[in-house]
From Swiss-Prot:
Transmembrane feature ranges: none
Keyword Transcription applies: no
Compositional bias of kind Polar residues: 16-37
One GO BP annotation of this record: cytoplasmic translational initiation
Recorded family membership: Belongs to the eIF-2B alpha/beta/delta subunits family.
Annotated InterPro entries: IF-2B-related (IPR000649), IF_2B-like_C (IPR042529), NagB/RpiA_transferase-like (IPR037171)
Protein name per its UniProtKB record: Translation initiation factor eIF2B subunit delta
Species, as recorded: Schizosaccharomyces pombe (strain 972 / ATCC 24843)
Main location: cytoplasm
Region (Disordered): 1-106
The keyword Cytoplasm is annotated on this UniProt entry: yes
Length: 467
C-alpha cells in the first residue's frame, strides 16, 4: 500500500527535525527506528502524536549530550556552587528587611518542639506562640507598642476594658509620632503603618474582641478622612475620635451600667462575683456608697488569682466579703441571692464569652434559681456565634499551672516542676468559656436591661449611628 505525493511531502516535514538533531549529536537508535518507511501503513492520530513526542525527546537528549561534550567538567560544578550563594544572599537581605522571617533560633526551635510534643490534639488549631522578648522586633514598631505588647504577653493588664483603653492610648502616641512618607497621604498610608503595629501585638497575645472592635472603628475613621486635610489636622481629628470612643463607649457606658445594675441590689443581698471585673466592682462600690447593705462572695481560681485584686478593692471600700475558690462553689451557692458577672464579649446568639469558670457559675446559679446578671458594654458585642469554647479560645502557657504558691512572690513548683520531661503528661490552660443564653437572666448594657438574645438588634443600631 503506497503513499500519495502529498503524504510523502508531509512525512518529509515531520522527519526534518530528526535529521537536524542527528547531525548535531549523532543518530540515536530511537531516532533511527522512528523513521517511517513508505511500505508501513498510515498511523492513527494517537500514534502520530506519540511518535512526534518521541522524536522531540530524542532531539533534546542529543543536544544535551553535545553540550556536555563541549563544556569542561568544572563549569557545571561552579554554577551549582554559585546558585546556593545567590539564594543565601537573598535570604540574608530578606531577613534584614523583615526580622520576623529570619531563621529561628535554637531557643525558638526547642520551644516549638516541646509544644508539639505536649500539645493537646483537640486544641492544636489554637495559636500558642507568644513574643515575650524584644528580640528580632521589626524596626517600624513604635516603642509604645512594644511596651504594651510585653505587658500583654506577661498578663500584666487585667480586664478587656483596660486592655482596650491601653490599646487606644498607645495608638494615640503612634499617630502623634507618625510622619507621612513623601508621595502618599495620611488616609492612605496610616492604615498600613497601623497594621504593622497590630501584627506585632497579635504576636504577643491574641487581641480581645473589644480590641478588635476598637481597631475596626479606628480604621474606619482613618479611611473617611478628607484628603484635603493637612497631616496635623488629620491627626488632631483622629485623636479627638479616639478620645470620644473611650469616653462614650467605655467610660460613660460603664457609668450607665452602674446606675442600672445598682437598682437590682437590695438590702440583705448576698452578691456573688467571679474573678476581677472592673464594671462589676464599680457596681458594688456604688451600691455601697448609696447606703445599701449587702455582702459579697468573691470566687477565685488558679492560676492568676485575679479575684484577690477584686477582694482587696472591695474591702478597701468597707464592703463585707467572703473569699472562696471555685472548687467550693457548690457549698456557698445556697447563701447567694444574686450573681453579677462581667463579660469579655456578648456573642450574636446571646451567649456570654467570659473567663473560664463563668459557665460553671452560671449553671449552678440557674439550677439554684439564683438570678444571673451579666454586665457588658455594647462595644464588646460581636456578630460572632459560638456554641462551645473549643473552636475559638486562647491558650495560656502551661507553665502557669506549675507554681503552687499562694501569691505572685512565692515560688512553689510542686509535683509539676519537671512536667515537660514527663512522658504522656500534658498541661492545658484555657482562658475563656461560653455561657449559653438560657443560663443568663438579663444583660445590663448602656441601653438598659435587655435579654441577651437582643445583641443583634443593638449591633445593628450602632452600625446605623457610626455608618
Amino acid at each position: 500500500m503506497g503513499f500519495s505525493a502529498e503524504q510523502a511531502k508531509k512525512d518529509g516535514k515531520d522527519q526534518s527535525p530528526v535529521s537536524e538533531s542527528s547531525s548535531v549529536g549523532g543518530t540515536s537508535p530511537a531516532t533511527a527506528s522512528s523513521v517511517v518507511s513508505p511500505n508501513e501503513p498510515k498511523l492513527s492520530g494517537k500514534e502520530a502524536k506519540a511518535l512526534k513526542k518521541a522524536r522531540k525527546q530524542a532531539s533534546r537528549r542529543a543536544k544535551a549530550e553535545a553540550a556536555a561534550a563541549n563544556n569542561p567538567p568544572g563549569v557545571s560544578e561552579e554554577k551549582k556552587v554559585a546558585i546556593p550563594n545567590k539564594n543565601s544572599n537573598q535570604q540574608k537581605k530578606a531577613s534584614k528587611q523583615n526580622p520576623q522571617n529570619s531563621p529561628e533560633t535554637d531557643a525558638n526551635l526547642q520551644e516549638k518542639k516541646i509544644f508539639e510534643e505536649k500539645q493537646v490534639s483537640i486544641f492544636s488549631h489554637l495559636d500558642w506562640r507568644r513574643r515575650r522578648t524584644t528580640e528580632n522586633i521589626p524596626k517600624d514598631i513604635h516603642p509604645a507598642v512594644i511596651r504594651l505588647g510585653l505587658k500583654l504577653a506577661n498578663y500584666k493588664i487585667f480586664g478587656s476594658n483596660q486592655r482596650c483603653i491601653d490599646l487606644l492610648k498607645t495608638f494615640k502616641i503612634v499617630i502623634q509620632d507618625y510622619q507621612t512618607p513623601y508621595g502618599t497621604t495620611l488616609s492612605r498610608h496610616l492604615t498600613t503603618h497601623i497594621n504593622s503595629q497590630i501584627a506585632y501585638l497579635v504576636s504577643t497575645r491574641p487581641l480581645s474582641i473589644s480590641m478588635g472592635n476598637a481597631i475596626r472603628f479606628l480604621k474606619l475613621e482613618i479611611s473617611v478622612l478628607d484628603i484635603d486635610l493637612t497631616d496635623d489636622e488629620g491627626k488632631e481629628l483622629l485623636l479627638e475620635k479616639i478620645d470620644s470612643y473611650i469616653r462614650d463607649r467605655i467610660i460613660i457606658a460603664g457609668q450607665v451600667i452602674v446606675q442600672a445594675a445598682t437598682e437590682k441590689i437590695q438590702d440583705g443581698d448576698v452578691i456573688l462575683t467571679y474573678l476581677h471585673s472592673s464594671t462589676v466592682n464599680d457596681v458594688l462600690i456604688h451600691a455601697k456608697n448609696v447606703g445599701k447593705k449587702f455582702r459579697v462572695v468573691v470566687v477565685d481560681s488558679r492560676p492568676e488569682f485575679e479575684g484577690r485584686v477584686c477582694l482587696k478593692l472591695l474591702t478597701e471600700h468597707g464592703i463585707e466579703c467572703t473569699y472562696v475558690m471555685i472548687s467550693a462553689l457548690s457549698y456557698i451557692m445556697q447563701e447567694v441571692t444574686k450573681i453579677f458577672l462581667g463579660g469579655h464579649a456578648m456573642l450574636s446568639n446571646g451567649a456570654l464569652y467570659s473567663r473560664a469558670g463563668t459557665s460553671l457559675i452560671s449553671l449552678l446559679g440557674h439550677e439554684s434559681n439564683v438570678p444571673v446578671i451579666a454586665c457588658c458594654e455594647s462595644y464588646k458585642f460581636t456578630e460572632r456565634i459560638q456554641l462551645d469554647s473549643l473552636v475559638y479560645n486562647e491558650l495560656a502557657p502551661g507553665d502557669q499551672l506549675v507554681n503552687m504558691g499562694v501569691d505572685d512572690f512565692e515560688e512553689k513548683p510542686g509535683v509539676l516542676a519537671n512536667w515537660k520531661s514527663v512522658k504522656n503528661l500534658k498541661l492545658l490552660s484555657l482562658k475563656y468559656d461560653v455561657t449559653p443564653p438560657r443560663l443568663i437572666t438579663v444583660c445590663v448594657c448602656e441601653m438598659g436591661l435587655l435579654p441577651s438574645t437582643s445583641v443583634p438588634a443593638i449591633i445593628n443600631e450602632f452600625k446605623q449611628v457610626y455608618a
